């Protein structure tokens, strides 16, 4: 068998050597366009003809070519000085068009945005030098810096900003700018964005929507982006890698890298590159993060990439959604059950079990973000408190089967999770074990999202969210989004919470809105936190794990949103190389 | 159109006329049956930031709010104009995606195709020449083993041996990181091709080895071989000369007919080796609910397989003139000719292709 | 009962080719039963995540080592094979059933015959794996998807063969007599065709079976097959990539080898049965895998 393997390799390497012209023609079709496609067929025919008698002379040739291949292969040092290779996955298959959704997470690389968050989540101007909201909270007046230039050399003006926002509003991509009524030019460096209704979370669009040039934006833009950001594209081989270099026209600080390469492909691609020393930063799955190779260290980044249990909070009374999905659950409709679950979950154990320790307990949906209200989610692992809560509410185990009941209703429910996700599976199984101790029987059910869609208004589901915008929180807890898509699956509704969130949206500034967002979680007598209605039991926040070269200094990192990988590029322009080149 | 290959082409074209539309309907039915919500697959993790209004707009932009049969006719109308629709997961016309990704796949599949043919038929000839002795047994065992081992598993073993343990060859991608196409040397392409091609070609050699061996043994036991041997031709020369010619003609046919399998193998190989070709796009389309792209890829592969079969027939007839449809048969009355011709042609082909019984 | 036992024993202990086939068949049947029964009955503790025992090399305690999450590879492989065998059995059964129905329909009704043969042609003209992906996609993936995908793509060759056989049968005198006596097509199929097609049908089943499990593994590998929370060879191999790059070769070796051995056993059995029950293929009798499946 080994003999055959070697034989196969030899003969094959001979072929590799000789069909180079075909490979060239095929892979470099753009450059070598003059080669006609007949060459492939020629090779087949010649191969057939040459087969019969020439075979014996070939092994020698093959041996020679094999040796040559290996020797040239080893002398190749592919990484040049001060060029950076990142294998953090997350290839944007749809291209680099902000209007279709590029740049929502991490840095848009090629484009710049009006505003940005610094690592501590404070708002800063990027293209904008001032941003003022009108008294009726409907018009943003934004002044632009005057030194912004696109990478093709043309200056960025108010026209481009207005064009970008209006086009994004009408586009059917992954940038939801539907809240915008109209963007208009005031003068060369001032624009006004008019909203449909007061909405402070529109700031999120100012932070994430990269500005495109009006003059050259068109069909092929997504694959050949031009922007005023820190980088410009050198080459994007789809499915393989993206190569960028600093944009000489960028208005920011100088970037210490001649070239930055993003290698795509699966997790295993990154692991290989890390082990062979070819990549300086690699996104690794938590299960394997603990043994970084020589010259690299583990970087574990905090995130709000959270997982929790969404409870149906209305009792089952036979109602269904338009699509016929049943609504309501008579067990989880009782607040006592939901609070007891919150108290009975050992979140530290779940972090160990499901995340290999690379995570932190989640108490609320926005742990660590400026609009979080820690008071609202004060809960710790305390089975005794959970039992007390249940006893007080009348849930007692009378028949001695280990499951509590009240009025003939057993304290049990199914817990759905996406079967394709092993982390969620571990969380569901772990939660079931822990809750059995306090007398609640949980039956974990792995299912596809299509099945979950049908049962999610009736049974608790393991869900994950985590965006860097309070808009997400509004979507999850607002009575207006009850039953809409995956947002508020439990039909949670609290008029006071809605009131606080509406006030937050109508705030005069980002800073002013924070207090109202916090009040929605707990305002002293109600809220959606555990102290209040507890429609969710949050379990864990993931930590995103990377292997980083010891020579690479990334500085302070922003807390990560949902999505492992690309968010780490948020401050890429300020990264430094600390070793000699 | 009087030549033999012209007639063959005509026959195949007629087949295409009913086969392609039927295939199109079947494929479209399959993708429309899928219970996967494409909007959800597209939006993915950003679900929380995409409001219901925007989701409805996306749905309308893709025409998903219309019933299936209307979508089918839309698609068909565009297809006739050479437009395969727009890929959802790549946000580009399907045709662009296919053209963009085809070269990488062609390089991979082309090399594997040739390598498999060379190695497969070579081993087949070797096995037949040493019939019954240890090389024959070894090769037959090898062919049996690889025909039942999962191709992707072989790929993993190769990576384990050559990329991880020995560290001779790269285990991923088409080029080293940080190198653009303009800067790349041909040997860099070559090095990165080795493992994927090795995997893909090994998978295709199994049936070929057995086929060539069988044919060659049939020839060597036949009267013509006996005749040549009596005239003093050595067994080796017999096997390599006229024997090989006898066996390889049909080997080409068998091998070309396996193009479909090759594409299937490339889907798995490209996934493992992070090869930026059509196979990778297929997986992305299937897991990302990208129905237009999936349809496009399926249609293109159907056409490629049909072309492969056509090429197989032409090559087979070119190598072996007896397989050509002879012009004199053309003179028979048209109505009666067709069924008769088919039957007789089949009979003749059968008797000629038949392995002579071992004496 | 005693006579049945005696005849079974006498067949199994025969020293000729038939006896060998039966012995192999009996052996494979025992293997399958043991695996499905054993794989399903494995204690959960063997498969539980155990951070203290991550990536251990094969030892006396763990014959085939442990994976990245500390699960015993031997148990996982066994459970994965059981899962694969279940899906394979179901899919192959559905597939051969479909082939049988198609073949008989074609033989008994001329217009259905045209439909069946053009359907067969179409299915054979399409690249196999692409079709598998499309059908799996149509059913939304998962265990259900992969079962249907394999079932709906493996019937054409067997159907073509059974159609041919059934057509010969229909032409025979006794069928013609029955037909002229006014027997319905259903009756003819049940009493005349089915019994005669049984051997081919069984041989077809055994030949299709290894293909079914190999293709199931392939689909699961790319994420369109069995859900990752169930043990299955394809999923295990897909997850083993990372471990293998870290040098843990045993994680890859065991599942693949297990799958290969099972497939190999059935391939040999199918080859034997095919030689006995199915007419020899013209030209290329040595090429086993693609012929019927």
Task: Enumerate the language-model features and the residues they cover.
Chain B
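N-terminal signal-anchor/signal peptide hydrophobic helix marking the start
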Residues: 10-16
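Hydrophobic alpha-helical membrane-insertion segments
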Residues: 20-29, 145-162, 254-260
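Individual transmembrane alpha-helix segments
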Residues: 67-111
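Short hydrophobic, aromatic-rich alpha-helical segments embedded in or entering the lipid bilayer
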Residues: 49-81, 273-285
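Membrane-interfacial helix-loop-helix junctions in multi-pass membrane proteins
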Residues: 59-68, 85-90, 94, 176-193, ...
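Hydrophobic alpha-helical transmembrane segments of membrane transport/permease proteins
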Residues: 20-70, 166-186
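Membrane-water interface segments at transmembrane-helix boundaries in multipass membrane proteins
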Residues: 141-206
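Alpha-helical transmembrane segments of integral membrane proteins
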Residues: 2-7, 20, 98-135, 151, ...
């Amino acid at each position: 068998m080994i003999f055959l393997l070697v034989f196969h390799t030899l003969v094959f390497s001979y072929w590799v050597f000789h069909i180079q012209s075909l490979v060239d023609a095929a892979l470099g079709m753009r450059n070598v366009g003059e080669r006609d496609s007949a060459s492939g067929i020629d090779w087949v025919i010649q191969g057939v003809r040459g087969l019969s008698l020439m075979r014996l002379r070939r092994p020698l040739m093959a041996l020679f070519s094999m040796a040559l291949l290996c020797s040239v292969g080893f002398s190749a040092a592919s990484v040049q000085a001060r060029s950076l290779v990142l294998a953090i996955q997350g290839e944007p298959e749809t291209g680099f068009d902000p209007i279709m959704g590029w740049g929502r997470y991490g840095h848009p690389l090629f484009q710049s945005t009006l505003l940005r968050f610094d690592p501590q989540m404070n708002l800063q101007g990027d293209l904008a030098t001032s941003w003022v909201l009108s008294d009726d909270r409907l018009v943003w007046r934004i002044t632009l810096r005057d030194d912004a230039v696109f990478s093709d050399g043309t200056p960025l003006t108010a026209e481009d900003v207005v064009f970008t926002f209006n086009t994004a509003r009408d586009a059917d991509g992954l940038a939801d700018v539907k809240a915008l009524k109209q963007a208009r030019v005031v003068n060369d460096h001032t624009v006004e964005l008019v909203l449909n209704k007061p909405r402070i979370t529109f700031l999120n669009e100012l932070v994430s929507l990269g500005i495109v040039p009006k003059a050259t934006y068109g069909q092929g833009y997504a694959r050949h982006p031009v922007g005023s950001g820190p980088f410009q594209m050198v080459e994007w081989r789809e499915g393989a890698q993206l190569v960028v270099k600093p944009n000489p026209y960028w208005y920011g600080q100088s970037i210490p890298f001649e070239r930055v390469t993003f290698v795509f492909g699966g997790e295993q691609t990154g692991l290989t590159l890390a082990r062979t020393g070819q990549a300086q930063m690699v996104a690794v799955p938590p299960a394997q993060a603990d043994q970084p190779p020589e010259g690299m260290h583990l970087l574990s980044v905090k995130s709000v990439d959270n997982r929790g249990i969404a409870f149906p909070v209305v009792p089952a009374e036979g109602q269904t959604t338009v699509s016929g999905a049943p609504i309501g659950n008579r067990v989880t409709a009782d607040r006592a059950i939901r609070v007891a679950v919150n108290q009975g979950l050992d979140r530290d154990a779940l972090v160990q079990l499901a995340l290999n320790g690379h995570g932190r307990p989640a108490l609320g949906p926005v742990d660590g973000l400026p609009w979080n209200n820690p008071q609202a989610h004060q809960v710790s692992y305390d089975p005794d408190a959970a039992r007390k809560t249940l006893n007080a509410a009348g849930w007692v185990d009378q028949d001695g089967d280990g499951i509590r009941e009240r009025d003939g209703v057993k304290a049990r429910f199914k817990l759905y999770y996406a079967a394709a996700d092993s982390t969620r599976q571990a969380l569901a199984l772990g939660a079931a074990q822990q809750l059995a101790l306090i007398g609640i029987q949980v039956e974990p059910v792995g299912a596809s999202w299509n099945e979950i869609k049908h049962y999610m208004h009736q049974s608790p589901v393991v869900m994950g969210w985590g965006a860097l915008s309070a808009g997400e929180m509004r979507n999850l807890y607002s009575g207006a989004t009850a039953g809409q898509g995956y947002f508020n699956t439990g039909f949670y509704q609290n008029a006071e919470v809605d009131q606080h969130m509406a006030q937050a949206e109508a705030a005069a500034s980002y800073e002013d809105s924070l207090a109202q967002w916090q009040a929605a979680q707990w305002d002293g007598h109600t809220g959606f936190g555990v102290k209040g209605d507890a429609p969710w039991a949050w379990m864990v926040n993931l930590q995103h794990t990377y292997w980083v070269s010891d020579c690479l200094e990334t500085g302070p990192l922003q807390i990560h949103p949902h999505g492992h990988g690309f968010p780490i590029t948020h401050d890429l322009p300020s990264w430094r190389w600390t070793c000699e080149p | 159109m009087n030549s033999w290959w012209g007639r063959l082409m005509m026959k195949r074209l007629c087949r295409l006329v009913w086969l392609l539309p039927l295939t199109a309907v079947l494929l479209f039915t399959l993708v429309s049956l899928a219970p996967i919500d494409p909007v959800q697959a597209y939006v993915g993790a950003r679900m929380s930031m995409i409001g219901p209004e925007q989701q409805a707009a996306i749905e309308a932009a893709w025409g998903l709010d219309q019933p299936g049969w209307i979508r089918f006719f839309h698609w068909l109308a565009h297809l006739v104009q050479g437009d395969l629709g727009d890929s959802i997961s790549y946000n580009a016309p399907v045709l662009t995606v296919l053209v963009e990704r085809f070269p990488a796949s062609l390089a991979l599949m082309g090399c594997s195709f040739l390598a498999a043919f060379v190695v497969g038929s070579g081993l087949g000839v070797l096995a037949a020449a040493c019939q019954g002795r240890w090389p024959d047994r070894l090769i037959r065992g090898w062919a049996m083993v690889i025909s039942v081992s999962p191709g992707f598993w072989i790929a993993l073993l190769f990576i384990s041996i050559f990329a991880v343990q020995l560290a001779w060859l790269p285990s991923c991608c088409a080029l080293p990181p940080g190198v653009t196409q303009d800067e790349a040397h041909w040997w860099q392409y070559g090095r990165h091709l080795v493992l994927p091609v090795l995997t893909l070609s090994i998978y295709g050699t199994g049936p070929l080895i057995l086929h060539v061996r069988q044919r060659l043994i049939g020839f060597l036991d036949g009267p013509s071989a006996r005749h040549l041997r009596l005239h003093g031709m050595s067994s080796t020369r017999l096997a390599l000369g006229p024997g090989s010619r006898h066996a390889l003609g049909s080997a080409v046919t068998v091998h070309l007919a396996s193009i479909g399998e090759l594409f299937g193998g490339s889907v798995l190989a490209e996934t493992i080796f992070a090869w930026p070709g059509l196979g990778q796009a297929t997986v992305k389309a299937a897991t990302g609910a990208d129905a237009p792209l999936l349809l496009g890829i399926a249609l293109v592969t159907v056409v490629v397989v049909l072309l492969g079969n056509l090429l197989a027939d032409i090559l087979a007839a070119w190598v072996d003139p007896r397989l050509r449809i002879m012009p004199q048969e053309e003179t028979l009355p048209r109505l009666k000719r067709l069924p008769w011709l088919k039957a007789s042609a089949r009979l003749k082909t059968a008797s000629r292709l038949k392995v002579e019984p071992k004496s | 009962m005693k006579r049945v036992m005696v005849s079974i024993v006498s067949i199994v202990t025969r020293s000729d080719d038939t006896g060998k086939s039966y012995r192999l068949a009996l052996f494979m049947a025992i293997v399958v039963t043991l695996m499905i029964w054993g794989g399903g009955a494995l204690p959960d503790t063997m498969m539980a995540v155990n951070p203290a025992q991550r990536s251990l090399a094969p030892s006396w305690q763990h014959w085939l080592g442990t994976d990245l999450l500390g699960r015993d590879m031997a148990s996982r492989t066994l459970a994965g094979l059981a899962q694969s065998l279940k899906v394979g059995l179901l899919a192959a059964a559905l597939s051969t059933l479909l082939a049988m129905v198609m073949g008989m329909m074609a033989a008994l009704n001329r217009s259905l015959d045209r439909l069946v043969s053009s359907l067969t042609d179409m299915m054979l003209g399409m690249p196999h794996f692409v079709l598998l992906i499309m059908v799996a996609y149509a059913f939304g993936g998962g265990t259900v998807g992969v079962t249907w995908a394999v079932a709906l793509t493996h019937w054409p060759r067997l159907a073509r063969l059974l159609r041919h056989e059934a057509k010969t049968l229909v032409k025979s005198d006794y069928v013609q007599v029955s037909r002229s006596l006014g027997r319905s097509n259903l009756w003819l199929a049940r009493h005349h065709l089915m019994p005669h097609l049984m051997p081919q049908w069984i041989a077809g089943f055994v030949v299709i079976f290894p293909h079914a499990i190999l293709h199931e593994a392939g689909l699961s590998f790319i994420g369109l097959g069995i859900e990752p929370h169930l043990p299955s060879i394809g999923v295990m191999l897909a997850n083993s990539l990372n471990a293998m790059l870290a040098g843990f070769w045993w994680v890859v070796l065991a599942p693949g080898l297990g799958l290969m051995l099972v497939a190999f056993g059935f391939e040999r059995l199918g080859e034997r049965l095919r030689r006995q029950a199915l007419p020899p293929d013209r030209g290329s009798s040595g090429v086993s895998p693609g012929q019927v499946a």
